[in-house]
Amino acid sequence: MSNQPDRIIIFDTTLRDGEQSPGASLTVEEKLTIARSLARLGVDIIEAGFPYASPGDFEAVQKIAQTVGTEDGPRICGLARATQKDIQTAAEAVKPAAKGRIHTFLATSDIHLQYKLKKTRQEVLAIVPDMVAYAKSLVDDVEFSPEDAGRSDPEFLYQVLERAIAAGATTINIPDTVGYTTPSEFGALIGGIKQNVPNIDQAIISVHGHNDLGLAVANFLEAVKNGARQLECTINGIGERAGNAALEELVMALHVRRQYFNPFLGRPPESTEPLTNINTKEIYRTSRLVSQLTGMMVQPNKAIVGKNAFAHESGIHQDGVLKNKLTYEIMDAESIGLTHNQIVLGKLSGRNAFRTRLKELGFELSDTEINNAFLRFKEVADKKKEITDWDLAAIVNDEMQQAPELFRLELVQVSCGDHACPTATVTLRTPDGQELTDAAIGTGPVDAVYKAINRVVQVPNELIEFSVKSVTAGIDAMGEVTIRLRYEDKIYSGYAANTDIITASARAYISALNRLYGSIQDQSATEVTKSEVAAI
């Protein structure tokens, strides 16, 4: 009996593998926000974390399972090494979900067996079915990954996969652990598994790959042609080292070129049925959300979601696009949710108009969140004559995506000029409720502000990234500031938007410091190293 779907299953691992990007650490609430966005996007499976790694990871997976893992929502997955403790913890974390999955893994390449696991092939052949069967006794849906499959002996790999499926694995995931394979090699690997594992039709073939050579998306598309039906990917392609296969690139490649891919899924070439369940109009907003919460900027020339993806500077190209978009565009910007930047509200607009427009833009906010965002909107509308959709998105993102306010910025004031020494005065409310004021001089106004804040907060850190960009055109445009701080080999991000760049810079810095300070407070929590799962 075949277990193969006639569409592609999208398995999102932004909250697990994506979070392993340096500096992409997220709070539980931020993970929940992203999970809700992924559910709106229409992903089939959310790998919400590695529950055994830390109490924070366990809490995040459990909360996502409770809140997002509804009957009509995505399947919620927890990662686990092939040990009983890991598997039991993962099962407990995903238990609240209507549809839960355990994803367990064990390396199969000789180099991993010899140097990391220190186990023989026979031992691995015994461990895999035992642990898969144990996972199956706790949940109905089990996925197994042979780590470093690309460098494993094919005959041994086939044996491992056959035993995993016989023990109850419903999905077999093939990882390109170090992003080494080429498309033809990866396609042949999947084709070999399809032909040589006797019970492979009882499981779905999944692929997971890293982008070290920039080939992850190409490898996955070749895998689809050879029988893969689940793609493990991340928003914006974030992940360990050079990242993972980018969800938006895979989905839009399958969407735009579905006539090419249809026959590989047993469909007539002319079929217009979508190949995935993804609501493509949610792609851009989800990309922005992940970028802002992780502090990882999207490069301007990034396919699909980059700032320049639908921009045409060449006069010949501009002329062609104006006459007919299809001359130089293979997809419509609106198909990924990139709307025209229309003017929608002004300072006389009321709360109902504000709420209605946010709902039209896809924001689902509580009454408290609406009230907070409306106050910010009024503040901006007093300074800026016309408020556009992009302004609204920046306002909501700024208000909703701040870290818990341990320190609160009450006042920032700067003095600078051609022949003046830049000076800043700041007032902060501390976690214990005190209001402290201090001042500092710097090489520029932002430097002076940050030095003044540091005198109050007194948490040593290194500013490693500072970026500013305008939300819209015009001299009165809002500016977005994204920063990243390093403290003891960990990186913390901050984001803020304001018509005043100095204020936005101060708020972004406080946001990052609040994450840093909160992390220091939580350092007593025991955490298992994630290095073993970094490449899965």
UniProtKB/Swiss-Prot annotation:
Cystine crosslinks: none
This enzyme's EC code(s): 2.3.3.13
A Pfam family recorded for this sequence: HCS_D2
Record: residues binding Mn(2+): 17, 208, 210, 244
Catalytic activity field: 3-methyl-2-oxobutanoate + acetyl-CoA + H2O = (2S)-2-isopropylmalate + CoA + H(+)
Molecular-function annotations in GO: 2-isopropylmalate synthase activity; acetyl-CoA C-acetyltransferase activity; manganese ion binding
Catalytic class of the enzyme: transferase
Main location: cytoplasm
Entry superkingdom: Bacteria
Summary of subunit composition and partner proteins: Homodimer.
Record's function text: Catalyzes the condensation of the acetyl group of acetyl-CoA with 3-methyl-2-oxobutanoate (2-ketoisovalerate) to form 3-carboxy-3-hydroxy-4-methylpentanoate (2-isopropylmalate).
Protein name per its UniProtKB record: 2-isopropylmalate synthase
Gene from which the chain derives: leuA
